[in-house]
Every structure is written in structure tokens, then in C-alpha cells.
Amino acid sequence: MASSENEPFCVKFIKSPENSEYFFKAYEAIKQIQSDESLQLTEEREALLLKEKDKSLYICDPFSGAAFSHLKKLGCRIVGPQVVIFCMENQRRVPRAEYPVYNMAMADVTISCTSLDKETREDVHHYVQIMGGCVYRDLNVSVTHLIAGEVGSKKYLVAASLEKPILLPSWVKELWEKSNQRIIRYSDVNMTEYLCPIFRGCTICVTGLSSLDRKEVQRLTALHGGEYTGQLKMNESTHLIVQEAKGQKYECARKWNVHCISVQWFFDSIEKGFCQDETMYKIEPASTIKSVPDTSTPTGGNSKPNSRTLYDVSQISNISTSCVNESAFNSAMASRLDPPADTLENLDISSLQAPDDLLDGCRIYLCGFGGRKLDKLRKLINNGGGVRFNQLTGDVTHIIVGETDEELKQFLNKTQHRPYVLTVKWLLDSFAKGHLQPEEIYFHSSYQQTEMPSPFEPAINLTANKMSSTRDPLNHTRNHQADEDLLSQYTENNSTLIEDEHPKTSNTNSISQMSMHEDMTTCTSQSGLADTSTIIEGGLFSRKQFMVLGFLEEDEACIIDIIKKSAGKVLSSQKRAIADYAVVPLLGCEVESTVGEVVTNAWLGMCIEQEKLLDPHSNALFTPVPFLEGSTPLRECVLSVSQFMGAERDSLVYLAGLLGAKVQEFFVRKANPKKGMFASTHLVLKDAEGSKYEAAKKWNLPAVTMNWLLQCARTGRKADEDSYLVDNVPEEDKDESFISQTYKPQAIRLSMHAPCHLENHPEALTKAAVTPLDMNRFKSKAFQSVISQHNKNPQTSGGESKVLQREPSLHLDTPSKFLSKDKLFKPSFDVKDALAALETPGGPNQKNRTQSTPLSEVIGRNLQLAIANSTRQTAAVTASPQLKAAEKKEFDNSKLLINVVICVSKKLIKKQGELNGIAASLGAEYRWCFDESVTHFIYHGRQNDMSREYKSVKERSGIYIVSEHWLFACSEQQKRVPEALYPHTYNPKMSLDISAVQDGSYTASKFSADTSLQQDENSELQLQQNNKFGETSDDQVKKAAGDGNPQNPSKDVKGALTQTLEMRENFQRQLQEFMSATSVVKPRGSVGRAGFDNSPCTPEGARSTRNGRSRVLEALRQSRQAMTDLNTEPSQNEQIIWDDPTAREERAKLVSNLQWPDSPSQYSEQLQHNMNDAGGNYTPAKESLTDTEIAELEACEFEPKSAMRTPVIENNLQSPTKPDHLTPTPQAPSIAFPLANPPVAPQPREKPVQPFSKEETLKERRFQLSSLDPQERIDYSQLIEELGGVVIEKQCFDPSCTHIVVGHPLRNEKYLASMAAGKWVLHRSYLEACRAAKRFIQEEDYEWGSMSILSAVTNINPQQRMLAEAAMRWRKKLQGIKQNMGIAEGAFSGWKVILNVDQTKEPGFKRLLQSGGAKVFAGHSSPLFKEASHLFADFSKLKPDEPRVNVAEAAAQGVNCLKPEYIADYLMKELPPPMNNYCLPDAIPYVRVTGTGLSRKRKTSGDVSDVKRSRHY
């Protein structure tokens, strides 16, 4: 049997009695493709005769026995049968490994190990190699997974930073065990269960933390795989969390080389998901940190290098003065605002009686407190119903500061939404007076407040409180400036003199209008005026010269500091040089010098915020605002400003305050004096979107643009809101730029006393300079031929002549204006005529067509793409003015995808440029990297793709993940097609070509809207008819209303019918071909298919759910589309000829599942099937349906019923219409299978509406709201009251409530108590459905736990799902008992409970138990044991001096002595959990194991009915 070198390759199967079924399956598979000479079935004894290694491939199964060991010893190439099957199925080579490979479960996996003992590491290596994986000793870029025994090694930190999965060795063992049972891949095992815990191998000790923080660290450590110890032990403790670098533990830890880190390390590790590098959080002794003594003498270590050329001039005399005065100011402010130290220390909390919801909506972070002070403040916040945060996040609304903190300053400098930074006196005064105090008078002195909370004050002057105490620093500034003037005589020419000799105009508008990201608190004491000779190259204002005029001295110093930090140069007013910009207050001031542009501090602030130089004329707030002094036309108005941020928002708030208006953050309909809210009268915003805008429309309150405010300021009178509604803003008015920067006036003089001079500028100031387009620059012959033909035709259109009449008014600049050596010349071209020349000449139906020649389409798209790119790259340079189009078109290519922002996946990187170009030509924006502004993610992959990029995008709600073909379809069809038709799994070769059918229905629907609207002037009433019979988009309605040319109805209808019938034949032909390839019987029960012709057509383009359209019908359409998961994407017309069995089965499934989106009968069948399916196995088309869509699953039934009561639609489209009736929208013929008989409209399936019983109608509905946003609370509270309900505003559960509306199921008191009492626990979509029906409706389909809610809301975790199901289960159970027995039961009925828990938690437990019908004893004395049935105790939370119950004595008398966790688990789990698992340690000896887990007292109690006992089974 010894093989020679010339022996051919052979596959040998080693036969043994233990061979598995895979062995014979692999043999048969190879036998089909391998010749008999190269395939052998060998016995074990023959294999043992082999003397040396040969070239054969040996197939062994199992990897054991004498033959396997012999072959392995010789070094033969051995694989298992699973390897053969895997490689044949995946067309891969059999691995040439130096070791046997049993299966390919870990193919494509490369692992490296860290922190494992030698034996475990060798086991891991062995199993990985035997499963087809690769092993590296060192960590490199090829490694895909890291196997770790514990955290903290260098490999661990590098792998975590590279986001590589870090797993436990048990993952490899689990893969090996499962791969022995069946053929699997490593991805089939859930890796999340085997991820290395964050603190694996860490033994953590703490010092200096409060008791509550210590317990929190202990809990989280155990939760994340670490070990917590109270004592610091040598060779055991690995980490010591230190509050301050002192103490015995700290000193010992340093000696024993234990990591001494801050508590931030602990929480950052949890937040980022892996153990952080300890060196970044190391706590050093104070002596090593502070090595420089506190002296007034400047040293190199704590002062910035002086950039001036004269180094021998000392300025030391000025520094000490500023330091002393700044200290005096700080101490004065602190003494005024902060309470004495002993006030909080000696405060008796019990003396402060305040409402439970005093702090409702306040999210509070405590900073700079410790010990007893911190505990008292926590109790105050809990008692007042506030939410306390342990970490600084963007959700915090109030920060209460004790001692100053540098980390807090850094957070405030970075955050966009600054919370209130207050002293503790605000909290104490609020509790003492029983209502929230205004925050303005409690600002902390050490932290600057940039928001403007009160509209009554013109602005919060940053330094208003400093004026009386900082006179000396101001004098120092003047002296300092005098020194600068002296030194400037000897410096270079680029230094700048700053003088304050010209008179300042006092103005109430201070620098606080701007949202500055710089820290301005030291701009007066440590001003940067000495650095005026330094130019920071490449800064925002590099090579720009400024003048600062009209501000108070301290504000001026701050503005100068801001400009210089951005590389700008500041000139004095007496300098002869011409400044580029003069910065003035918002209302302007007199400018004597010659400057290029006069801008406001709002312009400066927004330039800093956006980090780019903005066009001064792109925003009305960038130039001085005309204001009629002394007028307050908005005295009775309460404004809310939305969608504006930073300096722009502050300026609007300031302006509104000057006009007499009140400005508040929340937009409310009713006043709430308790919370200091007024009833809003106006909403000022940018765009017609957002929750506040929807609320304004609902409440009929004006939603206006900021131009309304500017007009009020300009005229001194309240302007008409209808002229400034945000709905009426045309698209061309939304452009940012108004005046080209190429034109700059030589001198502009603005007077504070005559602000109306802005209106007297010449026309050149309001019209941009246009560079005419040179037609000779286009070399294309096709383009030149089109232009030449266009020039020969006389212009007859009135619209075009209008445009041409405007040409002579162009103001062209001479080359000396724009050909400057310091400025880049960027011309703008007027290409309107060129694009118009490419359009197809208009016909009789031109307004309904957008067809053009292929050549013009290509050229037009490329021109638009070039213009879009040019505009994007030159944002600072304004383009030519947009002239009105000669002929209004129904569609504009550049606005098809307006407000769409796309990002292309890395998988499609090669197509990214092409896809971005298509998107830009359709009016969309694109991003090279995914960010928060992206609305559509272009991706291609499988249904459950495991790529990190896909999962990260999928976690974000509201993002469309679509195929690249969606963009192609939008471009081809010249409309925004529905995203649901093009998911990321879309394959054009695997779908039917039915897109044309949708176009047909769209045309017919549009025609119906046109004709019916022309017959009746009441467009609003007709719109309601369209919503019922053929929902028409808003754009179509507007088009029809404005169309003055009469149409030919019969001609269009016949054309639509002919086109649709052709589509029907084509569609039918495809289906017949599919059906001929399969033997699947056509599904029965689809009687309603004959009713296609009368089914409502829903064009996908109509997306608005509030503007004249039923939100119920819209959400039903979307939700049904998601639930049935229709595969109706447009595709190419390809057919399969080869008879593949798998493909035939798939075609059969496609035919059986194929349904038309416009057929209500088929939809109802599929929906009914899905709703009745207990498993609920359907895949939603998107991550989670919106609340409104969920609401429509049931509420939509009202709309079809109302439609059925209206006059029946005639089948004959040509029939005359009675003049006294509105013409209903005719329906487009649908595509259906040919029927022998004429189509008959089926009777719609009506779900019988159960009328409310008399008792239910009369019963008052009392609601509680939980886990909702503040704006949602306000909106839903208003809705409930309008419908006749009552809203209970309590922080805790109220037994009188009948319904609780919950955002998300949480294991809190409100939710559990509602569950125990059998209340209705509803999703917020219930209220949306009630809003649509305008009355309270049945609750069943909107209850947490119902299939309609759980199937639609997919982003809940298992615990939330268990809570949701438990709520419905208890509600049904308790209501059933009430109906059958006539008695009101609770979940805890019959319980008699003794509580021995923490005093702060006892009221909550008591309310929870009592809501479920339990009787709770006051106290826990021994005589109560005879009556009690349950005792709940938690000694770990009790203080040493608090009394404790005698558990042993209670258990001896038959009381169930349990941990409090039993209460929640009893409610959540379907079967009551065994009491033995929750038994207190002292009661274990007395537990008698019974079938029900009940004690003797419960078993023998005669007063407990069978109904009560049945709950335990």
C-alpha cells in the first residue's frame, strides 16, 4: 500500500461502524463528479497498513479510532464529511491544512487569544483549527475575533478600539458542540451571549464614595461580570475607584500596584461597552499635579507666549489688579446667591411639604455635593417627582451646582442645548413656596448662561452684574491699551491700534444674543488685546479686518476676543484703513468710517457656530434690523420659537422681547400658572414641519416665519399673520443668498435714529450681478444644433417676453470690482434659456406631460448636476437670481426629492459618484459619510444582514434603507416612488414588471381629481370625497384647482382604459407563464378579486397625513403594506426557461402570494390571516411603525364604513352626472385574472362594530400618562379633555384611573400597579385613533400585549414584551372575574402583607399592593403574624438603627417570608413563580415543599375562594 511519487490523487473514505449519515451523503456527492479510479471506500484495517504519507485525501468520521490516529501520526491530509459537503455546496476548495479539519463551522474566522491559561488556550486553538478556522498568536489586521479570559490586556484594548468582537472561550466550545449535531456556520450562534463582560477578571473596591454610589457601583460591577469587595486586599483587588487622592486605601493601593482610577473610568467603560484603559483615568497625588506655586508673577508654565517684537518691556503691573478684582466679584456674587453652608447641612426635609409633581418634567444633575448634602438633595428631587441623572447628558434640563467643576465647564462649552445652571437655593425656595421659582435669579455665578429665559428683559448682559465691581479692570484695559499704543510705534506695520476715544452708543442689546462657544468669563480680566499683532493663518477670519462699534465696553472686549481667536484683525475707528466688516448691535448704530459691510453680532455668532464665513445678506438678521423705537405691538402675544438655534434664535427672542411679546420654550394651548406657562398665540419657525407645527395647525394658531417679526419691528404695528404663514413660503424664497458678494458699496452709513435707510438702497443692492452665458463655450454639436434651432424660432410666449423684459435692468460690475488679487473670481451663469431650449414643444396636454427627448434629458440632467455641484462648492458666493420659468410645469426634476438626504453604503463605493450625481439632479442632498441628517441609506444586501454598517443604520429610527434601484426608478419615472417597493434586498431579476400598472392608476386618479374639482368650486369638500374614493395627492389637488383650461374627459378616460387593459394583458401573460411552471393549486377564497374596478386607488406619492387627508387611511395603507410584505417591485421583463425545481417552487410561492396593493379584499384576507396567526410570522417592511400607523390598524374601519353610506359610484365612467351631486372620483380599472362573468363589486367585509354599553358610555374615563415626552403629554392631555375624559396628573399611581397610556412598558410603580388593578394599559396609538374618530373607541386593539401592537412595535426587548403581555393577561382575568362573580378583584386579593423595607421605598410598595387588593399592615409586630399571609423584607437596604422583623418567628407561624422581587415577578410571569426561589434565608428551615408553593396558612385558609387560588396554577 506504500504510495509512490507518481501515484495519482485519490479520495479515500475510511469506513467504520460509527460513520454518520454525513459520511454517506458526502460519498454519494463525490461519486457523482469523481471517477471510480480516484474514489475509494477503504476499511480501517487497510488504512492501518499504510507506512508513509501519501497524496490522498482521507475522509474520516468520527475523528477517533485506531485508523484516524494512525493517519494523523503519518501527517496525512484528513477532513470530515461535513467539509466535503460544505465545499461542494459553496464551490470552495478543500482546505490544505497541516491538521485534520472536521467541519467548516469557523471557516473565514481568524482568532487570537489573550489572558487565557495554557491549557485553555491549547483547547481553543485545537477546536478552532478542527472547525476550519485560523489561529494567530499575535494580534494583527487579519484577526477577526479575540478570545479573552479577562479584560485589560494590550490585545484587549487594541481589539476593542478596532471594534473587533471579544468573546469568551465558551463560544468556541458551543460552536463545536452544535457543529457535531448539524452543519452550521459560526454566525448561527448568537455571539452576544458569549461576549466578554466589561469587568471580567476585575476585583473592584471603592473609597470616598457615598453609600448610594457605592451600592450602585456594587450592583453594576456584578451585572457586568466583575467582582466587588468592600475591603482592599493584596493580590486580589485590581482596581480602586477613588474620589480624592487621599486615605489609607489609596496609599495601600499605590504600594500594591492596584489601579487607582476615578469613577469616570467605571461609567465610561459601561457606556462604551468595553473596559477602558486605566492610564487615561489615573488619580495622581495632589503634589504631583500642582508643581507651580500660586504667585502673581507670570511664569512660562502658566502664561501664553508674548508674540510682540519688543521683549524687554514688562507688563507685570497690570496683572495683579485684574486678579484681585475678579476675585472680589466672584466672592460678591457667591455671597449673594449661594446659601450658607450650614443651611443645607441643618435642613429638615420633613418640614418642606410640596406637591408630588413639583419637579415634574425637570431632569436634574447634581454637581459638587457630597455626603449628607447629596443625600438630602436626592430625597428632595425624588419627593418632588423630578428625574435625577448620574451623568451629564443632553437630556438634562437643570444643573444644581455646589462646588465648581472643570468638567462641567467643558460640557457647557461643547453642548448645543445649555441647561439651567443654578444654585441650590432655587431648589430650596421652590419647595418652600410650593411651586417652581423662575430660574433667572438663581443662575450660578461661575457659569455663564447664554440662553435668554425671560422675554421681558431685552437681554441678559453677560457683565451687567459686574459693572459695579469691575471698574478697576476696565481702567486696567484702558491703561493696557495706552501701553499698546506706545509699543505700536516700534512694531511692524501689521499691528493694529484699538482706541476707545469715539463715544459708545448705549444699547441694551448685549453680546448675550450670540451663542458663543468660547468661554467669555475672563475676557475683561485677561483680555487678549495684547495679541493684536498676531495673525493666525488659516483661521475663519484670516485676512479680514473688523471694526466693533456701538457696544458696551465689556461686550466690545468680548467680541474683539472672539474675532481675534478666529484669526481676524480689529481696527480702531480712527484708523484710515478700510475695514471689511463693521460689527454693530442688532438694531444698528452710526458708522462714521468707510467699511465694506455692516454686520450685526448675530452674523458673527452664526459664523462661529457654522465655522464658515456667511454671506451678510443671506439672513435678515445679519444686517441691522429697522426698528420703530417705543412701539410694542406684540404686548398681548405669547410666542414660541422653533427650529432656530444659537445666535439666530437668541436674536429673534431678543427682538420679540423688544416688541413686547412673551417668549416661552413650550408651545401650549392652555395656560398653566403652576408651571409658569402662558397660552401660546404664535409659533415662529423656519419650515412647515415638526410636532409644534402640527399642533399649531390643529389648534388653528398662526405658524409664521421670522419675516413677520421683522415686519412688526419695521412698521411698529402688528403685521397680518396670513401674509407670513410658513405654509405660504414659496420654494424660491427659501434660498439663503439674496445679494451677490461681488458687489460691495464703498461706504454705508447706518444711523440708530434712522434705521429705515435700509429701504432706500439703490436697486443694485437687491439684485445680483449676472454673468451672461457664452453659448460658444459649448462644443457639443448636438447642443449647438438645438440652440441654433431655438434662435431661429420667434418668441411668442408671454411668459418668455416677461423674462426678457427684465434683462436691461441687470447691474453688471466692472472688472475692477471683482478681479481683486485677494479674492477668487467665481462667476455665475444664467442657464435658464439653455435648459428651456431643450424642452419638447408644448402640445394640447402639455401640463399633464413631462416627456422630453432622450438627448435633452441627458444634457439637462448633467447641466443641473453641474449647477448643483457649483452651488455647493461656492456656498459663500451667491449665484445669479432665479428668473421665473417661461411655462409652469407639473414636475420639476430638481425638486423631485426635495428634503431627501442620501448616503451610499461602503459596499457600493464604486457607484457612489454616479448615485450622488443622480440624487443631486433630482433635488436631493448627499453625504459622503453617514450622519444624523441622512434620511435615505442606499444599501444592497440580504434580509438579515450582519454587517456592522447595516446594523448601525437599522438601529436609527426613521431612516429608509433602500436599494440603488430606487434612485434609478425616481429618475426614470420622474416622481418619488415609494421606498417600500425598493428595499435593500431588491433584485430586479426576481420581481414582476408591474410598475406601469401603478402609473396607470395614478393617471386615472389624477384625472378624477381634475374633473371633479372643475365641476365644483368647493375644493375642500371635494378633497374629502377624493380621500374616500380615490385618495389624491395634495399636489394634484392644487394643480387641478389652478388649471383653467378645460379637459376632454372622454378622451383621457378612454386612453387610460386602453393603456390599463394593455397592462392587464401583459401582467396576465406573465402570471400564466409562472403558473404553467408549477403545479400549485390556485388559492381559493379570493372572491373579492372581482371588485378591483371599484376599489380605491392609492397613489404612493401622497404622503401627507394631516393636510386634508385621513391619517387613519394613510396609516392603514402603510401598515398593511408592511404586514403583508408584498413583493411587487418594478423589474425588467426576464423569464426563466431552464426548469429548476427550486426556482419553480419559488415561482409558485410568488403566484400564491401575489396581491395587488389596491385590492381591499385581498388585503383584508391577508391581514386577517396574519392577525389570526398565533405565531405572527411576518416580517415588517421597516423597523417599527409610527404611532399614527399603529393607530390606524383598527380606527381605519370607521372611514370605509362612512364611505359606504355615501352614494354608490357608477360603473360607467361616461354616464352623466347629476348637477346637484358632486362627481365621485372614478376608479382606474385594475389588473385582475380574466373572469367569465362581468366584474361585480363585492360587498366589503364589515367588522361588526359593537356598540358601547350604557354603563360603558356613562362611565367617566380617567387617564394617567407615563413614559411620554413633555410635548406629548401636553398634546394628549388636551385631546383627552376635548373628548370628555379626565387627565390625572400625579407622579404616582391613582386607583381612580381607568386607563393608563404608556410610551414604553417599564417596571415602575405606575405600570405594575395598573396591571395589578386590571386597568387598561394602552399604547399611545389609542389616542391617535380616538383623535381620528373624534370620540373614545374600543380599546382592545391598542392594548399593550395585543398582537396588533406587539407585531407593529418591534423594537422592544424581551422584558418589555413580557410586561406588555402580562398587562393584558391580568386585565382580562380580573375583568372576567368581575363579570362572572360580580365582585371587584385585584391581583393580590386575599393577601395580608407585612412590609419591612427601606422607608423611602415603602410607600411605593404599599400603593402597589393596595392597588391589587392586598391589605397592608402598618408595622411589623409579632401579633400581626397570626393574620398575615405574606411578609416582604429587604434587610440589605435597611439602616443599622432601623427595626427588623423576626423572620423566623413569622415563618414558624406560616407566613410566606419573601423577597420584594417576588411581587413584580408574580405579576409578570404567566405562572406564579415558586416561592422557594424568593424565600428569605431565615425562613428556609420552615418552608414546606408543596405543590403550589404556598405555606400551611394559605393552604388551610378557609376564606380564600377557588377563584383566588386558581391564580397560582
UniProtKB/Swiss-Prot annotation:
Main subcellular location: nucleus
Residue ranges of the motif Nuclear localization signal: 844-850, 1508-1511
Localization per Swiss-Prot or TrEMBL: Nucleus; Chromosome; Cytoplasm, Cytoskeleton, Microtubule organizing center, Centrosome; Cytoplasm, Cytoskeleton, Spindle pole
Positions with biased composition (Polar residues): 789-799
Cited InterPro entries: BRCT_dom (IPR001357), BRCT_dom_sf (IPR036420), BRCT_TopBP1_rpt8 (IPR049936), Secretoglobin_sf (IPR035960), TopBP1-like_BRCT0 (IPR049542), TopBP1_BRCT_1 (IPR044737)
Annotated effect of mutating residue 1131 to A: Prevents phosphorylation. Prevents role in checkpoint activation
In-chain residues carrying the UniProt-annotated modification Phosphoserine: 1131
Entry keyword Repeat: yes
Pfam families to which the protein is assigned, alphabetical: BRCT (PF00533), BRCT_TopB1_SLF1 (PF23294), PTCB-BRCT (PF12738), TopBP1_BRCT0 (PF21298)
Matching Gene3D superfamilies: BRCT domain
GO cellular component, one term: centrosome
Job of this protein: Scaffold protein that acts as a key protein-protein adapter in DNA replication and DNA repair. Composed of multiple BRCT domains, which specifically recognize and bind phosphorylated proteins, bringing proteins together into functional combinations. Required for DNA replication initiation but not for the formation of pre-replicative complexes or the elongation stages. Necessary for the loading of replication factors onto chromatin, including gmnc, cdc45, DNA polymerases and components of the GINS complex such as ginsl/sld5.
Subunit structure of this chain's protein: Interacts with cdc45. Interacts (via BRCT domains) with ticrr; interaction is cdk2-dependent. Interacts with atr in the presence of atrip. Interacts with recql4 (via N-terminus). Interacts with gmnc. Interacts with cip2a; forming the CIP2A-TOPBP1 complex.
Name under which the protein is recorded: DNA topoisomerase 2-binding protein 1-A
Species for this entry: Xenopus laevis
